Amino acid sequence: MDLEYQKKLAAKVAGVGLDRVRINPEKIDLVSEAVTRADIRRLIRSGAIEILQKRGISGARKKPRRKGPGSRKGGKYSKLPRKRRWIRKIRALRRELRRMKEQGLIDSKEYRELYAKLSSFNSVSQLRAHVGR
């Protein structure tokens, strides 16, 4: 059975391309009798004709973003503001300090002292060097 007309009509009614129209193989006889747009709409509602979901493009295939220095506009901190940098650094330091305490490298008293002056360290490696273990 040639259902090309019905498929084209369904695509037009649904406002999609031909590739997104799928006719249920079990209900071919019903679809072949459809002639009008109203018939096609009824078949879409009943599920004899299915409109497939639009296919996306995976992140890997997307065009790569141009993030090089030549594309950047704005100052030094417009891409990564000072506050974001601070949050990233302080969270890393706190995480490392907690790990040191759990591993027994520092005791609770040392932990409190270091936590209070955590802002004076620039990096996790500097904190490790200060503890010296």
Swiss-Prot record:
SMART domains: Ribosomal_L19e (SM01416). Residues 55-83 are annotated as: Disordered. Residues 60-83 have a biased composition (Basic residues). InterPro entries: 60S_ribosomal_eL19_sf, Ribosomal_eL19, Ribosomal_eL19_dom, Ribosomal_eL19_dom1. One of its GO terms (cellular component) is cytosolic large ribosomal subunit. SUPFAM superfamilies: Ribosomal protein L19 (L19e). One of its GO terms (biological process) is translation. Keywords: Ribonucleoprotein, Ribosomal protein, RNA-binding, rRNA-binding. Pfam families: Ribosomal_L19e (PF01280), Ribosomal_L19e_C (PF25476). The keyword RNA-binding applies. One of its GO terms (molecular function) is large ribosomal subunit rRNA binding. Part of the 50S ribosomal subunit. Binds to the 23S rRNA. Belongs to the eukaryotic ribosomal protein eL19 family. This is Large ribosomal subunit protein eL19. It comes from Korarchaeum cryptofilum (strain OPF8).
